[in-house]
Amino acid sequence: MEDDIWKAVDLSGVFDEDSVELRPRLTSVSSPSLSSTPPPSPLSSPSWSEEELPAPRSDGSPASSISAHKSYPKIFQTFKKDLSEVTVDRLMYPSFYERVQISIQTEDQSWLQRISARKRIKRIPSIEITEAPQENLASKLRENWVINPEEPKLSILCEMEFNEDFVNFFETSLRTLPSIGPPTILSYRKEYSCMDVILKDEQELGATCEFCGSDLQSLFFNMDTSLDDAGTKGKSHRSCCLQFQNLLDYITEERLTTKSPEMELISISPHAAHGSDADRLKAKEKAMQRKQERQMARHFTIIPEQSPVGTEEDTKHLKTISYQLSGDYLQNVRTEEVDLQITNISITCCDSWKICGKVMGNELLEKDYKHGSKFLTSFPDGTIQIFYPSGNLAIIRVPNKTDGFICIIQEDTATSPAILALFDSSGRSSCYHPNGNVWVYINILGGQYSDQAGNRIRTWNWSSTKPTPAFVSFKPVLLALNRYIGIRILEQDKVSIHFLAMGQQATICLGTKVVLQDPEEVPTLRFLSGDDLLLLASLIKIRRLFSKMEGCVNFPVSKAWERLKQPSYLSSLSLKLLALCQNSGIQQNIMETITELIKENE
C-alpha cells in the first residue's frame, strides 16, 4: 500500500529508488485530519498546477484518492492573488511542483532537514566572472556605501517564492544599509611576522674633508683632541689643508675661552691666630674708641655753617673719619589757612539723622527695600551706610578724628564711583557738578555758589560772622545731586542730606554753630582774591580808553575831547572797586597797583 502511494506521488526526480530511508513514516493515509485545507477551487488554483497534475487512474486506487484531495500550504492561502500570469522556471524552482502533501512531510523533522540540505546543494547559482572596468578610488568608495540590487547576493534573495512581497517590504531597506556585517575596524587583519625581514648592518662611512675631500680617519687617529694638548701648536701632519687647520685653531680657542677655571680648595684645618696678642689688643681698643665716638655724636648738635674751617695741617692729622646718617627728616611746613588763624572761635556740631521723620540714635539697625535689597545699616559708633536700590553705596557717614562726622556721597555706579559731595561737621563742605567742577563750597565763615563752567555766581557770609547787619540776608541753597539725593543749605547750622527711594526715606543733618568773639577781624569779602580785583581794575581802564577813542573819532580836529571826563558809570565802578579792596583785606601793594590803574588822569 505504501509503495503504491509513493509511485502515485512520483518523486523520482528527488529521491532515488534505493533511498528508502528518506521516506517519511505514513501513519494514517486515509485520515481526514491529514487534509488540512479544502480542495482549491478552479478559480483560485494556479495554471501551472493544472498542467502538471497526473491523470487519474480508473482502477480506483488509493493514489487517485490522495491526488483528488491535494491541497496547497496555508501560507499560499493568505495571499489572495492571481498567480495565472506567473511563469516559473522548472529547472530553477523544482520545489514549486506537485509533491507530497505538507501534512505528510512535516511529520518527521529529520526527513525535512535532509531534503533541505540537498536543495541547497542544487540551488547554488553559477557566478560569472567578468572583467571589471578600471575605476577610481571615489567610485569604489561609493560602491561600499550603496548596495546595488543587481549584485548576485541580492539577486539570490530576490529570487524567492514571494518576489513581489519581498520587493515591496525589504528591497528599499536593504538599499539604505551602509554595509552588512561588523564594522571594518573590527575586521581581522593578519599580522605579518618580521622574521623574514633581513636587517642590514650600519656601515660607517669614512670621514672626508669638506674643503679638499681627503680622508680624515688617519688624521683624527694621530691627533689628540683633549684640553690638555689644546694649547700646543698643531704640527704639520695634523691638517690636510689650510681651511681645515683654521677650523681646528678656531675650535681650540673657543674651548680655551669657555673652559671653567679650576677650583682652589682651601684648608679647613685649625690654624694659629693671625698677628700677635698686642696687635689684637690694639684692634679691640680702636673698635671701642669708634663706638664711643658714635655715641657722643648722637648727643651733640650739628656744627653750624659759620664755624671756622680747620687748616690743612689739622686735616692731615685726622686719620679716621667717623660719621653717622642723621635720623631727622624735613618737616613739611603747613600753611595755616585764614580760618585757623582766627582766634577765639567756638564750634558746635549739630549732627543727627532721621528715618521716615523719626529721630534715631547711634544703634545697630538694618532696613531693606521692598524687593529685598539692603537700604540702610547703622552701627553703635555712629557709622551709617545708605544704599541705592541697585545695591551700590550711596551715602556713608563715619566718625571724625576729633569731633563729629564726615559724610561722603557717591554716584550710582558699581565700579569707580565719582564723589558727588563731601560734608564735615566742622563746617567745611563741598558739592560737585557732574563734570567735576565745584558747585557749592562752604566753610565756617561763608560760602560761594558756582555754575557748571566754574564761574562764581554768588558768595555769602554766615550771619554769625557778619560784623554789621548791613548785608543782605542769606538765601537758601537747594541742590539735587541725582534722582535720589537732595541737599538743603538753609543756614550754617541747618545743612541736611535727604535720600528718598522706593518709599524709603532718610535724612542726615550736619550743621555747625560758630561763634566769633571779635567778628571785626574777619574780612567781609574774603572770597575775593587779589587777581580778581586786578582784573576788575584792568576792565575799568580799558573801558576808559575806549571812551577816549570814541571822542577822538567824533572830534578829529578839535581838542575838545581832552576836556571830556570819563563816563559816570566808570566812576561808580571805580568807587565800588575801592570799597571791595578795603573789605576783602588784600595786601597793601596790590591795593596800590589797583589805585594806579583806575586813575582818571591817564
Curated annotation (Swiss-Prot):
Residues 25-36 have a biased composition (Low complexity). Residues 22-67 are annotated as: Disordered. GO terms for cellular component: nucleus. Keywords: Nucleus. It comes from the Eukaryota. It holds the Pfam family FAM194. It is found in: Nucleus. InterPro entries: FAM194_C. Belongs to the ERICH6 family. This is Glutamate-rich protein 6. It comes from Rattus norvegicus (Rat).
